[in-house]
Amino acid sequence: MSTYTPPYQLTDAILRLSTEIAATVKEITVRGNLSAQPQLHRTNRIRSVHSSLAIEHNSLTLDQVTALLNGKRVLAPQQEVWEVQNAFRAYDLLPSLDPYSIDDLLKVHRAMMDGLVMGAGTFRNTGVGVYAGDQLIHAGTPAQYVPEAMQQLFVWLQNTTAHPLVASCVFHYEFEFIHPFADGNGRTGRLWQTLILRKWEPIFTYLPIESMILEHQADYYAALNAANTQGSATVFIEFMLEMILEALKNVYVKQHIKSPEDQLLVLLKSDPRMTIPVMAEHLGLSDRQIRRLIASLKAQNRLRREGSNKTGRWVVSRKSR
């Protein structure tokens, strides 16, 4: 089997972002033991699953995903419920997975897509394409070459001297380029990047990078398409490093915000339609405690509600920003 080296260049932006990410990881680790914060783990895992599936057009809200994790019934299309339940099972496998094992990759895909597609946990044996409407924008590697292409990619990953930050982004791009499965490539590729990163720094186990990708979804696909056009992963590496840094900065900010009121305002600035149960889930408080915080913030003119209870949104006043 020939040796394969994915094409990319180390740009000033990649070096700068990698340095800043490493420094931010160190700062977060020094200031707080995230491994000892199970509530944060739970909240971020919910955000990861919700965001990764929302990118794939799953319509369940953050509230509904939270309810499913809590064992509650949700009124939603059954397939979308299965997608969420499967994704939680797949992410729960992270601590036991080897990022250099193709067998483990197949295990993750099986968990992620069980009951959703034929052949879950096996490489595809037919052609596959990525479409924008009716327009084909990317054709995956021909099916007969997929096993060899994946083997070469895993050999490169295990032997590369590239920094894990860069290697994880390269793998993510190459995985999506090959598109080894009939379905579920996006959600599986994003999980595998998390797996590669957590081997470098455990903090990434519960870092919801997927939430940043969802917020910048158009840019995510634009970076993939630009890399395809340029025949190099460089632009995609730069994009993903920006998303990783943004996700880390969110954690860093929360570490420095001690007041529950200010923590709530940060949440509502990021998601103005967040419901009280989800606020409570994020902050580890009861619904009653959240209502008291909201009442206090309203009295201080730091928060107001626009629209109805069902369809409205929260507006954080400018003096609170």
Predicted regions: what is each one?
Residues 1-321:
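FIC/Doc superfamily catalytic core
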